[in-house]
Amino acid sequence: MAAINTKVKKAVIPVAGLGTRMLPATKAIPKEMLPLVDKPLIQYVVNECIAAGITEIVLVTHSSKNSIENHFDTSFELEAMLEKRVKRQLLDEVQSICPPHVTIMQVRQGLAKGLGHAVLCAHPVVGDEPVAVILPDVILDEYESDLSQDNLAEMIRRFDETGHSQIMVEPVADVTAYGVVDCKGVELAPGESVPMVGVVEKPKADVAPSNLAIVGRYVLSADIWPLLAKTPPGAGDEIQLTDAIDMLIEKETVEAYHMKGKSHDCGNKLGYMQAFVEYGIRHNTLGTEFKAWLEEEMGIKK
Protein backbone atom coordinates (compact mmCIF):
# COMPACT_ATOMS: atom_id res chain seq x y z
CA MET A 1 0.00 0.00 0.00
CA ALA A 2 1.27 3.47 -0.89
CA ALA A 3 2.66 5.55 1.94
CA ILE A 4 0.19 8.40 2.47
CA ASN A 5 2.85 10.88 3.61
CA THR A 6 5.07 10.40 0.55
CA LYS A 7 4.99 13.58 -1.52
CA VAL A 8 5.01 13.70 -5.31
CA LYS A 9 8.03 15.72 -6.44
CA LYS A 10 9.04 13.85 -9.61
CA ALA A 11 7.46 13.74 -13.06
CA VAL A 12 8.07 11.60 -16.12
CA ILE A 13 7.45 13.08 -19.57
CA PRO A 14 7.72 10.54 -22.43
CA VAL A 15 9.10 12.31 -25.52
CA ALA A 16 10.50 9.38 -27.51
CA GLY A 17 7.62 9.16 -30.01
CA LEU A 18 8.36 9.94 -33.65
CA GLY A 19 5.38 12.27 -34.18
CA THR A 20 4.15 10.64 -37.38
CA ARG A 21 0.76 12.38 -37.16
CA MET A 22 2.55 15.71 -37.63
CA LEU A 23 4.69 14.78 -40.65
CA PRO A 24 6.31 16.27 -42.65
CA ALA A 25 6.86 19.00 -40.02
CA THR A 26 8.38 16.46 -37.63
CA LYS A 27 10.75 14.79 -40.08
CA ALA A 28 13.73 16.69 -38.65
CA ILE A 29 12.16 18.49 -35.67
CA PRO A 30 10.75 16.69 -32.60
CA LYS A 31 7.00 17.29 -32.34
CA GLU A 32 7.60 18.50 -28.77
CA MET A 33 9.72 21.35 -30.16
CA LEU A 34 7.03 22.68 -32.49
CA PRO A 35 6.22 26.24 -31.39
CA LEU A 36 2.99 27.32 -29.76
CA VAL A 37 3.30 31.06 -30.46
CA ASP A 38 6.73 31.82 -28.91
CA LYS A 39 7.55 28.70 -26.88
CA PRO A 40 7.93 25.04 -27.87
CA LEU A 41 5.17 22.66 -26.79
CA ILE A 42 7.43 20.87 -24.31
CA GLN A 43 8.03 24.16 -22.47
CA TYR A 44 4.33 24.48 -21.64
CA VAL A 45 4.27 20.98 -20.19
CA VAL A 46 7.40 21.56 -18.12
CA ASN A 47 5.97 24.88 -16.88
CA GLU A 48 2.82 23.04 -15.82
CA CYS A 49 4.90 20.58 -13.79
CA ILE A 50 6.88 23.37 -12.12
CA ALA A 51 3.70 25.31 -11.27
CA ALA A 52 2.33 22.15 -9.64
CA GLY A 53 5.37 21.84 -7.36
CA ILE A 54 7.42 19.28 -9.28
CA THR A 55 11.16 19.75 -8.79
CA GLU A 56 12.60 16.76 -10.70
CA ILE A 57 11.57 16.03 -14.28
CA VAL A 58 12.66 12.98 -16.25
CA LEU A 59 12.39 13.17 -20.04
CA VAL A 60 12.24 9.73 -21.66
CA THR A 61 13.89 10.45 -24.99
CA HIS A 62 15.08 8.99 -28.29
CA SER A 63 18.33 9.55 -30.18
CA SER A 64 16.53 11.96 -32.53
CA LYS A 65 15.43 14.26 -29.69
CA ASN A 66 18.69 16.04 -28.82
CA SER A 67 17.13 19.44 -29.44
CA ILE A 68 14.80 18.90 -26.47
CA GLU A 69 17.76 18.30 -24.19
CA ASN A 70 19.53 21.33 -25.65
CA HIS A 71 16.49 23.53 -25.05
CA PHE A 72 16.65 22.92 -21.31
CA ASP A 73 20.45 23.16 -21.11
CA THR A 74 22.32 26.39 -20.46
CA SER A 75 23.42 28.25 -23.61
CA PHE A 76 26.40 30.28 -22.40
CA GLU A 77 27.13 31.79 -25.81
CA LEU A 78 23.54 32.96 -26.31
CA GLU A 79 23.29 34.37 -22.80
CA ALA A 80 26.60 36.21 -23.17
CA MET A 81 25.42 37.73 -26.45
CA LEU A 82 22.11 38.88 -24.93
CA GLU A 83 23.97 40.33 -21.94
CA LYS A 84 26.37 42.21 -24.20
CA ARG A 85 23.52 43.66 -26.26
CA VAL A 86 21.54 44.56 -23.11
CA LYS A 87 18.61 42.37 -24.14
CA ARG A 88 17.54 41.96 -20.52
CA GLN A 89 13.97 40.76 -21.15
CA LEU A 90 15.09 38.10 -23.62
CA LEU A 91 17.90 37.05 -21.28
CA ASP A 92 15.44 36.63 -18.42
CA GLU A 93 13.13 34.55 -20.62
CA VAL A 94 15.97 32.28 -21.72
CA GLN A 95 17.27 31.83 -18.17
CA SER A 96 13.78 31.06 -16.86
CA ILE A 97 13.35 28.07 -19.19
CA CYS A 98 14.70 25.86 -16.39
CA PRO A 99 14.63 27.53 -12.95
CA PRO A 100 17.58 26.83 -10.61
CA HIS A 101 15.47 24.77 -8.18
CA VAL A 102 14.33 22.37 -10.93
CA THR A 103 16.37 19.45 -12.24
CA ILE A 104 15.63 18.08 -15.72
CA MET A 105 17.15 14.71 -16.58
CA GLN A 106 17.03 12.44 -19.62
CA VAL A 107 16.88 8.69 -20.06
CA ARG A 108 16.69 6.82 -23.36
CA GLN A 109 13.93 4.48 -24.48
CA GLY A 110 15.93 2.22 -26.76
CA LEU A 111 12.94 0.41 -28.25
CA ALA A 112 9.46 1.75 -28.96
CA LYS A 113 7.56 -0.66 -26.72
CA GLY A 114 4.69 1.50 -25.55
CA LEU A 115 3.84 4.14 -22.97
CA GLY A 116 4.11 1.73 -20.06
CA HIS A 117 7.61 0.77 -21.16
CA ALA A 118 8.58 4.44 -21.55
CA VAL A 119 7.51 5.16 -17.97
CA LEU A 120 9.35 2.06 -16.77
CA CYS A 121 12.55 3.34 -18.39
CA ALA A 122 12.47 6.20 -15.87
CA HIS A 123 12.24 3.90 -12.84
CA PRO A 124 16.01 3.78 -12.15
CA VAL A 125 16.01 7.59 -11.92
CA VAL A 126 12.72 8.09 -10.08
CA GLY A 127 13.25 5.19 -7.68
CA ASP A 128 10.47 3.51 -5.71
CA GLU A 129 8.52 6.72 -5.27
CA PRO A 130 5.15 8.04 -6.43
CA VAL A 131 5.35 9.84 -9.74
CA ALA A 132 3.43 12.14 -12.06
CA VAL A 133 3.26 11.08 -15.71
CA ILE A 134 2.61 13.85 -18.23
CA LEU A 135 1.93 13.24 -21.93
CA PRO A 136 3.37 16.17 -23.91
CA ASP A 137 0.87 15.99 -26.79
CA VAL A 138 -1.80 17.41 -24.49
CA ILE A 139 -1.57 21.06 -23.46
CA LEU A 140 -3.82 22.18 -20.62
CA ASP A 141 -5.05 25.67 -21.47
CA GLU A 142 -3.29 28.02 -19.04
CA TYR A 143 -5.86 30.73 -19.75
CA GLU A 144 -8.76 28.54 -18.61
CA SER A 145 -7.34 27.30 -15.29
CA ASP A 146 -4.74 28.14 -12.65
CA LEU A 147 -1.73 25.85 -13.15
CA SER A 148 -0.59 26.41 -9.56
CA GLN A 149 -3.94 25.37 -8.06
CA ASP A 150 -5.95 23.29 -10.54
CA ASN A 151 -5.55 20.08 -12.49
CA LEU A 152 -2.07 18.55 -12.00
CA ALA A 153 -1.47 20.66 -8.87
CA GLU A 154 -4.82 19.58 -7.44
CA MET A 155 -4.21 15.93 -8.33
CA ILE A 156 -0.89 16.03 -6.49
CA ARG A 157 -2.51 17.62 -3.43
CA ARG A 158 -5.22 14.99 -3.48
CA PHE A 159 -2.62 12.21 -3.65
CA ASP A 160 -0.52 13.75 -0.89
CA GLU A 161 -3.61 13.89 1.34
CA THR A 162 -5.08 10.45 0.61
CA GLY A 163 -2.45 8.26 -1.05
CA HIS A 164 -4.94 7.59 -3.87
CA SER A 165 -3.55 7.61 -7.41
CA GLN A 166 -5.23 10.16 -9.69
CA ILE A 167 -6.10 9.87 -13.40
CA MET A 168 -7.22 13.05 -15.19
CA VAL A 169 -10.34 12.75 -17.34
CA GLU A 170 -12.64 14.99 -19.37
CA PRO A 171 -15.94 14.38 -21.21
CA VAL A 172 -15.61 13.63 -24.93
CA ALA A 173 -18.14 13.21 -27.72
CA ASP A 174 -16.39 10.26 -29.42
CA VAL A 175 -15.37 7.68 -26.81
CA THR A 176 -14.11 5.24 -29.46
CA ALA A 177 -10.83 7.14 -29.82
CA TYR A 178 -9.79 7.20 -26.15
CA GLY A 179 -9.18 5.27 -22.99
CA VAL A 180 -12.42 5.65 -21.03
CA VAL A 181 -12.77 5.24 -17.26
CA ASP A 182 -15.50 3.37 -15.39
CA CYS A 183 -16.71 5.21 -12.28
CA LYS A 184 -19.87 3.11 -11.84
CA GLY A 185 -21.99 5.89 -13.27
CA VAL A 186 -21.05 8.46 -10.63
CA GLU A 187 -21.44 12.04 -11.85
CA LEU A 188 -18.21 14.01 -11.69
CA ALA A 189 -17.88 17.81 -11.67
CA PRO A 190 -14.70 19.67 -12.69
CA GLY A 191 -12.14 19.54 -9.89
CA GLU A 192 -13.71 16.47 -8.25
CA SER A 193 -12.20 13.00 -7.80
CA VAL A 194 -14.11 9.73 -7.42
CA PRO A 195 -12.91 6.11 -7.24
CA MET A 196 -12.79 4.28 -10.55
CA VAL A 197 -13.17 0.55 -11.16
CA GLY A 198 -11.50 0.19 -14.53
CA VAL A 199 -10.29 1.58 -17.84
CA VAL A 200 -11.58 0.51 -21.26
CA GLU A 201 -9.40 1.30 -24.27
CA LYS A 202 -11.33 2.70 -27.26
CA PRO A 203 -14.69 1.09 -26.44
CA LYS A 204 -17.63 0.91 -28.81
CA ALA A 205 -20.00 3.77 -28.11
CA ASP A 206 -22.87 1.51 -27.05
CA VAL A 207 -20.84 -0.30 -24.40
CA ALA A 208 -18.63 2.53 -23.10
CA PRO A 209 -18.80 2.76 -19.29
CA SER A 210 -18.82 6.59 -19.43
CA ASN A 211 -17.90 9.52 -21.64
CA LEU A 212 -14.90 10.38 -19.45
CA ALA A 213 -11.68 9.99 -21.43
CA ILE A 214 -8.16 9.99 -20.00
CA VAL A 215 -6.51 13.32 -20.78
CA GLY A 216 -2.82 12.46 -20.37
CA ARG A 217 -2.09 13.34 -16.74
CA TYR A 218 -1.47 10.69 -14.10
CA VAL A 219 -0.34 10.81 -10.48
CA LEU A 220 0.58 7.27 -9.52
CA SER A 221 1.58 5.64 -6.26
CA ALA A 222 4.90 3.83 -5.92
CA ASP A 223 2.98 0.56 -6.26
CA ILE A 224 2.81 1.16 -10.01
CA TRP A 225 6.47 0.21 -10.49
CA PRO A 226 6.33 -3.54 -9.75
CA LEU A 227 3.06 -3.74 -11.69
CA LEU A 228 4.62 -2.11 -14.76
CA ALA A 229 7.56 -4.49 -14.49
CA LYS A 230 5.26 -7.50 -14.79
CA THR A 231 2.79 -6.07 -17.32
CA PRO A 232 2.80 -8.29 -20.43
CA PRO A 233 2.71 -6.77 -23.91
CA GLY A 234 -0.84 -5.87 -24.88
CA ALA A 235 -2.33 -3.96 -27.82
CA GLY A 236 0.22 -3.50 -30.61
CA ASP A 237 2.62 -5.80 -28.74
CA GLU A 238 3.40 -2.85 -26.47
CA ILE A 239 3.46 -2.49 -22.70
CA GLN A 240 0.38 -0.42 -21.95
CA LEU A 241 0.22 1.92 -18.96
CA THR A 242 -3.54 1.35 -18.73
CA ASP A 243 -2.97 -2.39 -18.19
CA ALA A 244 -0.76 -1.61 -15.20
CA ILE A 245 -3.36 0.87 -13.91
CA ASP A 246 -6.02 -1.84 -14.11
CA MET A 247 -3.84 -4.01 -11.88
CA LEU A 248 -3.29 -1.05 -9.55
CA ILE A 249 -7.08 -0.62 -9.24
CA GLU A 250 -7.32 -4.21 -8.01
CA LYS A 251 -4.70 -3.45 -5.36
CA GLU A 252 -5.71 -0.01 -4.05
CA THR A 253 -7.97 2.99 -4.60
CA VAL A 254 -7.42 4.84 -7.87
CA GLU A 255 -9.47 7.97 -8.54
CA ALA A 256 -10.61 9.76 -11.69
CA TYR A 257 -10.04 13.51 -11.48
CA HIS A 258 -12.26 15.72 -13.67
CA MET A 259 -10.12 18.32 -15.44
CA LYS A 260 -10.89 22.01 -14.99
CA GLY A 261 -10.86 24.26 -18.04
CA LYS A 262 -9.96 22.81 -21.43
CA SER A 263 -7.21 20.84 -23.14
CA HIS A 264 -5.61 20.98 -26.58
CA ASP A 265 -4.48 17.83 -28.41
CA CYS A 266 -1.38 19.17 -30.14
CA GLY A 267 -0.41 15.71 -31.38
CA ASN A 268 -2.61 16.14 -34.45
CA LYS A 269 -2.61 18.93 -37.01
CA LEU A 270 -6.10 20.31 -36.40
CA GLY A 271 -5.70 20.37 -32.61
CA TYR A 272 -2.31 22.06 -32.97
CA MET A 273 -3.71 24.72 -35.31
CA GLN A 274 -6.62 25.39 -32.97
CA ALA A 275 -4.28 25.74 -29.98
CA PHE A 276 -2.04 28.11 -31.93
CA VAL A 277 -4.96 30.41 -32.74
CA GLU A 278 -6.37 30.34 -29.20
CA TYR A 279 -2.99 31.06 -27.62
CA GLY A 280 -2.22 33.63 -30.29
CA ILE A 281 -5.28 35.79 -29.63
CA ARG A 282 -4.59 35.68 -25.87
CA HIS A 283 -0.87 36.39 -25.98
CA ASN A 284 0.02 39.23 -23.60
CA THR A 285 1.90 41.29 -26.20
CA LEU A 286 0.79 39.95 -29.60
CA GLY A 287 -2.78 38.94 -28.83
CA THR A 288 -4.65 42.18 -29.55
CA GLU A 289 -2.95 42.77 -32.89
CA PHE A 290 -3.21 39.11 -33.91
CA LYS A 291 -6.92 38.97 -33.03
CA ALA A 292 -7.61 42.14 -35.03
CA TRP A 293 -5.80 40.69 -38.05
CA LEU A 294 -7.67 37.40 -37.70
CA GLU A 295 -11.05 39.13 -37.52
CA GLU A 296 -10.18 41.15 -40.61
CA GLU A 297 -9.12 38.03 -42.51
CA MET A 298 -12.30 36.21 -41.50
CA GLY A 299 -14.48 39.20 -42.32
CA ILE A 300 -15.73 39.51 -38.75
CA LYS A 301 -17.19 42.88 -37.91
CA LYS A 302 -16.50 44.31 -34.47
From Swiss-Prot:
Belongs to the UDPGP type 2 family. It is an enzyme of class 2 (transferase). This is UTP--glucose-1-phosphate uridylyltransferase. It comes from the Bacteria. It catalyses: alpha-D-glucose 1-phosphate + UTP + H(+) = UDP-alpha-D-glucose + diphosphate. Its cofactor is Mg(2+). It comes from Escherichia coli (strain K12). It holds the Pfam family NTP_transferase. The keyword Translocase does not apply. SUPFAM superfamilies: Nucleotide-diphospho-sugar transferases. Its EC number is 2.7.7.9. InterPro entries: GalU_uridylyltTrfase_bac/arc, NTP_transferase_dom, Nucleotide-diphossugar_trans. GO terms for cellular component: cytosol; protein-containing complex. The gene is galU. Gene3D superfamilies: Spore Coat Polysaccharide Biosynthesis Protein SpsA, Chain A.
